[in-house]
Amino acid sequence: DRLDALRWIESADELFGDPFSGVRIVVHGISMGAATAMMVAGEVEHGLHQLPYVKCFVADCGYTSVWEQFKSELSAQFNLPAFPLLHISNWLCQLRYGWNFKEASPLEAVKRCSLPILFIHGDADTFVPTSMVHELYEAKSSPKELWLAPGVDHAHAYRDCTEEYTKQVKDFLNDYMQ
């Protein structure tokens, strides 16, 4: 997903940008999209992806890693421990597809990002535990912001708190989209 998102960002600059246009992009994702946005955040300034027109990120209810999310769901939904099921699944994924669950780590990605990230999370989220946003926030160096939507479950912060959500995002963009 992150590579597709990076290609879209590069395409947007090719389609809409020129050296004088001042293209500015914010990458905003919800749930798995937030995880993708954070994975992109870890690559925008490093390696082959020098994308100076990406100015900031909004990550709404993203998880710390695929491994931790699967582990959480195995426990919450099925009352199963991670071992051996998650370990075997991870091994099979590595054999068949050449990657493993631990590689998909937004937590590690945000550690590499110096651009601003607004973290949003419902404080009643049980699908992606709210504790994960605190881990992400602590791992990210400044600039960063955190807004916890009160009484909100997974991926419903905008739906349930539209006015405050809009204000939080708008204020963040006003601060960082120059």
Question: Positions of the model-derived regions?
Answer:
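Hydrolase active-site cap/lid region
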Residues: 39-102, 108
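Catalytic histidine-centered segment of alpha/beta-hydrolase-like enzymes
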Residues: 152-166
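Gly/Ala-rich beta-loop-alpha elbow adjacent to hydrolase catalytic centers
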Residues: 29-33, 37
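Alpha/beta-hydrolase active-site loop
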Residues: 1-17
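Acidic catalytic loop of the alpha/beta-hydrolase fold
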Residues: 123-128, 155-156
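Short alpha-helix in the alpha/beta-hydrolase fold that links the catalytic acid
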Residues: 106, 115, 129-138
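Short beta-strand/loop motif that positions the catalytic acidic residue
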Residues: 112-114, 119-121, 125
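Short beta-strand immediately N-terminal to the catalytic nucleophile in serine-hydrolase-like folds
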Residues: 26-29, 60, 120
